[in-house]
Amino acid sequence: MNKKKKPFLGMPAPLGYVPGLGRGATGFTTRSDIGPARDANDPVDDRHAPPGKRTVGDQMKKNQAADDDDEDLNDTNYDEFNGYAGSLFSSGPYEKDDEEADAIYAALDKRMDERRKERREQREKEEIEKYRMERPKIQQQFSDLKRKLAEVTEEEWLSIPEVGDARNKRQRNPRYEKLTPVPDSFFAKHLQTGENHTSVDPRQTQFGGLNTPYPGGLNTPYPGGMTPGLMTPGTGELDMRKIGQARNTLMDMRLSQVSDSVSGQTVVDPKGYLTDLNSMIPTHGGDINDIKKARLLLKSVRETNPHHPPAWIASARLEEVTGKLQVARNLIMKGTEMCPKSEDVWLEAARLQPGDTAKAVVAQAVRHLPQSVRIYIRAAELETDIRAKKRVLRKALEHVPNSVRLWKAAVELEEPEDARIMLSRAVECCPTSVELWLALARLETYENARKVLNKARENIPTDRHIWITAAKLEEANGNTQMVEKIIDRAITSLRANGVEINREQWIQDAEECDRAGSVATCQAVMRAVIGIGIEEEDRKHTWMEDADSCVAHNALECARAIYAYALQVFPSKKSVWLRAAYFEKNHGTRESLEALLQRAVAHCPKAEVLWLMGAKSKWLAGDVPAARSILALAFQANPNSEEIWLAAVKLESENDEYERARRLLAKARSSAPTARVFMKSVKLEWVQDNIRAAQDLCEEALRHYEDFPKLWMMKGQIEEQKEMMEKAREAYNQGLKKCPHSTPLWLLLSRLEEKIGQLTRARAILEKSRLKNPKNPGLWLESVRLEYRAGLKNIANTLMAKALQECPNSGILWSEAIFLEARPQRRTKSVDALKKCEHDPHVLLAVAKLFWSQRKITKAREWFHRTVKIDSDLGDAWAFFYKFELQHGTEEQQEEVRKRCESAEPRHGELWCAVSKDIANWQKKIGDILRLVAGRIKNTF
């Protein structure tokens, strides 16, 4: 047996043996081990395999099937809620119905996620805020301290000690290099020897100077050390005196540069040298490189085309903005040499030069350009003395006598008499200047002015201003009958000379005449041009727009003339009479209004509103008999008019003539038995405390008009006043059966239940009302307030969110939602409200109240003005505005708000109606109601 042969060779390997594993070797596979690639249809090596297993494709299918069957259906992979982790049917075919099912499940998941999204985001937000409160950042911890750093003064900053150094002593206290000043003896030796020394010989410091012994140890002086040749001054002599002189010269040059001001005076303060330097910093904002590029570019333009004026002007302005004023002056003067005929270059040179130099520049410019008006004007501006200005302008007029600008400038400096003489010459030199002719006419007497204007018409037959001035002249001298003729002749003459009559321009001229006080002229112009260029069917609409435009421009006489002309053309148009009446009511006198209304009812006797306006005007003036007579005439023209009957009743009841009012109502019920007549009859008895009569009338009215909700409301309120809650509830319920869409009825029934403590029933009533009247903001608002009054703020907020989803454009809901929010969130909510309801008066009122609560008085007043301007009929806005002025305004502002409210006569508003429709306040005036409503308002928002 061979001893070298290992005994385990040829023996089978033990179980689990991997060759080379003990020494860290790993196995690998090469291409030769795998063999060539095979197709799926190639036969496998096992040629005797059964059918279905002979090809590579068969083997792959077999392996895939084995993988599909190898699903983990163990108990450990099973969950009671979700089932197995994998899909039990993943091996099955994925068909169209599977795809639809997956889409449905995905939509459900998405929907469920959206339902919880708001709550989840809120919870995450709260958790983040809680985490930040518990573990604030270092930056947040020191934020309040950092704000206090603004209070630290500069002295306190400087007194703060330096931060301590924690390094060791060797690092903290390094040995600084000791610098010793060079002694004068060193310079003296240098001057004597002519050598350049940069350091001191160590032997000199050791042995004390120049008598250093020879290194060999002997005391013999160094050979040649005292040789006379070494005493010769060297070529590098340093003259300290000359260095000091050069330094002083350099400083003088810098001071002289800084001291050059615009006026050429030396104003440098040596102590404030640095301050002066700072003031000379250029004020331009460009980059230095950009300025250099611009300078090079402009230089190239100047060199390429030296006779191009804009290049010189641009170059000078570039140097000016960079602070190099003298360079700019030099450049522009060079430009005047290269472009002596350029007006702009000379004007720029005069602008850049100081006073006296600028005058010299302008004088030189006049020699080159004796016809330039702008240069003469600039020369006059440079003069400070009036006589010098006159002299310059007169000299200019000798060279340019046909310049209107020069004449106007010269006339402005003269006294009236001299100006008249000068204008006489001016119109000869400039006969086509309308301004000069009109100026001369203003300075002349009446007779001479007429002659001047006639000459002006001969010279300028195409200008309308001359004719209008002539008309104003006649009106100013009392010849009003000539005004109409002059304007008519003006239209005829201008058309004959081929001038197109521009209606808009003439209306503007009429407005100017109105503002100047020439009433007859403005009315004549309006009558002459108001119908020019308008189609017949558009006349009424266009004229009403013109009248509104004149009112907006504060040209009231023009508007009055338009209405007068329109009433001549349309005498039977009720709308035109009404617009004219409202115009007189707002901008005219009571006499003019009554005169207009008398004419109006004569042309439109069937227009009830015109009769009523006339009667009301008389009543407000205290003339009750005249008001009665007007209403009597109105009865004759309109025998069965409900409005006139009720106006007559109101007139009598307001003047405490209750029996006459009862008789009128009885006649009205017999001749014009309308629901409103019955309602006024019930109210009259109610306010007189005749409850039995009021109830009888109410029952009679309901037999005729059971679908009129106000009658049911009055019946319920009368029962409620008598503390008969069951009968009141019954009345409201009966009314709701007949009028299920009446919001006030639902609100009265709900408040009745709340009043007697039936909160659940009140809530149910409001829910029922919202079902019968969807998208009703008033019902949603009452539901929110009901929960808020009950102390259930969370439910109130939830209801408000639902209300805004159903009624996203309701201003009254948004205004309530603003004040349901906490104070920090109100501003954001108000922005959202303004985006949704930009012009809603309730939202504007809420924003005004928000600014009021934040003590932003000016902004609050501005928003109150916006609110009452958008809707002057909202009484709540006036009440809040008046309350605001009572607290923060002056007496004049309070009185102004009260007067505006009385003229607006508001009729709507939740708080306003609660007071104005109260039986106890039925005879109160608008001003009294305003004070009562303002008194009920509390600053709790």
UniProtKB/Swiss-Prot annotation:
The keyword Repeat applies. GO terms for biological process: mRNA splicing, via spliceosome; positive regulation of transcription by RNA polymerase II; RNA localization; RNA splicing; RNA splicing, via transesterification reactions; spliceosomal complex assembly; spliceosomal tri-snRNP complex assembly. The keyword Transit peptide does not apply. It is found in: Nucleus, Nucleoplasm; Nucleus speckle. One of its GO terms (molecular function) is RNA binding. Residues 66-78 have a biased composition (Acidic residues). Keywords: Disease variant, mRNA processing, mRNA splicing, Nucleus, Phosphoprotein, Repeat, Retinitis pigmentosa, Spliceosome. It comes from the Eukaryota. The modification Phosphoserine is found at residues 143, 279. HAT repeats lie at residues 384-416, 418-444, 445-476, 554-586, 588-620, 622-654, 689-721, 723-755, 855-887. SMART domains: HAT (SM00386), TPR (SM00028). It is linked to Retinitis pigmentosa 60: A retinal dystrophy belonging to the group of pigmentary retinopathies. Retinitis pigmentosa is characterized by retinal pigment deposits visible on fundus examination and primary loss of rod photoreceptor cells followed by secondary loss of cone photoreceptors. Patients typically have night vision blindness and loss of midperipheral visual field. As their condition progresses, they lose their far peripheral visual field and eventually central vision as well. This is Pre-mRNA-processing factor 6. The gene is PRPF6.
